[in-house]
Amino acid sequence: MKFELDTTDGRARRGRLVFERGVVETPAFMPVGTYGTVKGMTPEEVEATGAQIILGNTFHLWLRPGQEIMKLHGDLHDFMQWKGPILTDSGGFQVFSLGDIRKITEQGVHFRNPINGDPIFLDPEKSMEIQYDLGSDIVMIFDECTPYPADWDYAKRSMEMSLRWAKRSRDRFDSLGNKNALFGIIQGSVYEDLRDISVKGLVEIGFDGYAVGGLAVGEPKEDMHRILEHVCPQIPADKPRYLMGVGKPEDLVEGVRRGIDMFDCVMPTRNARNGHLFVTDGVVKIRNAKHKSDTAPLDAECDCYTCRNYSRAYLHHLDRCNEILGARLNTIHNLRYYQRLMAGLRKAIEEGKLESFVTDFYQRQGRTVPPLNVD
């Protein structure tokens, strides 16, 4: 992987990730394909929304279908027939999400398989091996996603262990002869001094890119913005920056303003299945009765398959009847909305007009622009 940085506007960056499998224009949003599928979508449909890279889930694909089935096909690209690059998370966040059924030690994480209850152990080395078999174009280190709220002492211990796991991840990744990219993950909760230690330690180990982890886990938006403003300038400028698990459209805008290059989130697909649709002027809850006889498209400014062909009334009808097509059409639209937003951000950075784009984005939704505390 090669990262090319074209231009900046304030702290925002316009560039691209170059892989053997294709080019990803940044800032980029990555749809999430947890089980080897972006829910309800064929790879061709995902590509048609403008997505150039997707995310797969190491933890879930390890449990089902498992490494051996994956290797029978070649790798995850061959298994799911996605031709572009794939980033896989390490499984750390999913283990964090297991809560009481897991035990974290220095060696790794002991937990019970949520499918059948069998005891399982996952550590940095195993995570690197699974992601190697998946053929991931971007591999994420294995870390502990520090919960929120966490006091300073807990956050410090967690961050320090994640640093040790980062070194173990790096060593196993290298010993496998993996030629793809490996990203470090910055932890430290909402504490700037801990984030400083984490960034410094990861940069000393050396990675192809750096993710900001442990955000969007319940902390106030002001804390997320503050941490991004503090951390991003410390990440080497020639490496991509990835904000994990984020987020709402406004979170993408605010991340870009603070120097983030990559995002992923289940929100556009999950919300689509619940009839919660993103449009230029805000949000449409398609199951509400007011859409029953609305012959207008979902978003007059959207060029997606759904908006070019169907009315709000039809989408409302499909939702009320619990038709699978409704979830699919909603997903196509939400994914396209996110890709159109990213394309707009990229163009604004190129033209040096990011802040006017941001102002228009919020004004269209009747909201005020959050403060930006950067030099």
Swiss-Prot record:
GO molecular function terms noted in the UniProt entry: metal ion binding; tRNA-guanosine(34) queuine transglycosylase activity
Keywords of this entry: Glycosyltransferase, Metal-binding, Queuosine biosynthesis, Transferase, tRNA processing, Zinc
Pathway: tRNA modification; tRNA-queuosine biosynthesis
Annotated region described as RNA binding, given as residue ranges: 245-251, 269-273
Entry's Gene Ontology BP terms: queuosine biosynthetic process; tRNA wobble guanine modification; tRNA-guanine transglycosylation
Entry GO terms, CC: cytosol
Annotated binding of substrate, by residue: 89-93, 143, 187, 214
Cofactor: how and how many bound: Binds 1 zinc ion per subunit.
Family annotation (Pfam families): TGT
Origin superkingdom: Bacteria
Reaction catalysis annotation: 7-aminomethyl-7-carbaguanine + guanosine(34) in tRNA = 7-aminomethyl-7-carbaguanosine(34) in tRNA + guanine
Main enzyme class: transferase
Cofactor: Zn(2+)
Membrane-spanning residues: none
Quaternary structure and interacting proteins, as annotated: Homodimer. Within each dimer, one monomer is responsible for RNA recognition and catalysis, while the other monomer binds to the replacement base PreQ1.
HAMAP family: Q_tRNA_Tgt
Protein's name according to its UniProt entry: Queuine tRNA-ribosyltransferase
Organism: Klebsiella pneumoniae subsp. pneumoniae (strain ATCC 700721 / MGH 78578)
